[in-house]
From Swiss-Prot:
Its membrane topology: Multi-pass membrane protein
Keyword Glycoprotein listed: no
BP GO terms, sorted: protein insertion into membrane; protein transport
Protein family membership: Belongs to the OXA1/ALB3/YidC family. Type 1 subfamily.
Organism per entry: Haemophilus influenzae (strain 86-028NP)
Protein name listed in UniProt: Membrane protein insertase YidC
Gene giving rise to this polypeptide: yidC
Amino acid sequence: MDSRRSLLVLALIFISFLVYQQWQLDKNPPVQTEQTTSITATSDVPASSPSNSQAIADSQTRGRIITLENDVFRLKIDTLGGDVISSELLKYDAELDSKTPFELLKDTKEHIYIAQSGLIGKNGIDTRSGRAQYQIEGDNFKLAEGQESLSVPLLFEKDGVTYQKIFVLKRGSYDLGVDYKIDNQSGQAIEVEPYGQLKHSIIESSGNVAMPTYTGGAYSSSETNYKKYSFADMQDNNLSIDTKAGWVAVLQHYFVSAWIPNQDVNNQLYTITDSKNNVASIGYRGPVVTIPAGSQETITSSLWTGPKLQNQMATVANNLDLTVDYGWAWFIAKPLFWLLTFIQGIVSNWGLAIICVTIVVKAILYPLTKAQYTSMAKMRILQPKMQEMRERFGDDRQRMSQEMMKLYKEEKVNPLGGCLPILLQMPIFIALYWTFLEAVELRHAPFFGWIQDLSAQDPYYILPILMGISMFLLQKMSPTPVTDPTQQKVMNFMPLVFMFFFLWFPSGLVLYWLVSNLITIAQQQLIYRGLEKKGLHSRKK
């Protein structure tokens, strides 16, 4: 297989990958879960245990809005129910250089995405007749300089029971503690069930064939480390899974919100859809907690609302870092991302880090690249003998195949030797592709000049054009031209086909491919010099 045919194989693999990506985006089949059921409840609060099936109507009014802030996010809390109705991520701009924080959670007439939690059950304070109206003095609470954590308690009292809903902010963390401290002085035992859910407008995932993005639910259970559960899945079948530990989440490209309940108890993961209001909720329901008279009880949970920071999320809950979904190429993407991050820490530029990683990858693959060109050179030398066999055996394909295999063995030539570097290069490319789609660290990461966001397409298409030119040069430097006229025409169009597809790819990925082509050209010339000395190659006239 010569270089030009290698390009054709690469193109077929590449286009097949894009077609598969679009098919995955479009099909949205119902997902088979461990257990599915229809939950009859409104979208603000789930039903409690079967024996005490209560639900609460959607809140039509607001309580007082208070603001909580640490060094990475600013939250707005509704004192009616204690829901988180807004989260502004202070270290991430909404748009490139906008200087306006990206708002992940928000509640507007056009779009709802909020984090709700409460206490349901026999003595729950979130009931069909209304939700708990918490009290607190002050409106703004901010983590002070030198302070590592901040606790903000909301207070509600009813029938001799004092409920504190305590929000705990930590420095440098998007992990918000949401705890309940219950003091039962009612004279009799009470029973409550904690829940937490993420309520989101039902929308379709966005993006295109080159850069698909997922917006929808996901969960982790004792049986399933990580699984996406789209809004279409929720509309087809409401989720209901009993599990030890686990978590539920809503993913939005580079960002995620996730409820993490107490990991030491059994929880039920569920979804609720409200077609009338076009919203869906994914949440957890904890076990019944009995609090004897005169006793106190603390119920813990946490809410992650922020970017997909793999290292931090891994410390918050098992498998939460899997929301950075690299697909089947994860085993390549993870070390590549680690290498990218390590080099970026040295050079302080993600574009330079990509160039360095490309050099490392090409250096690792160099022995295979050398073997590829050596195999191709030997195959060219054998062409006269192979043509003679074709003429001698004519239509006897079996005999011709046997004789050719014998010839390959005698000459120590592997006819598939030219394919291996191409086949190894594609998984690396796909792994980098998913890294650019999933790694928030590359969002709005500049290179230089006109490239100010390596996760977005080149605004002036300069890199894709340069990449196409490099492919054309690489093709022209191929030592043996394709003899079949039809195949020749196809090969001549390959650089244009690739350039067209790469117009919409992340500029960082195009940069990788461009640098890879340039290194391949340099390696090719180095290898050819060695082959010329062995008489296996001659310069094209």
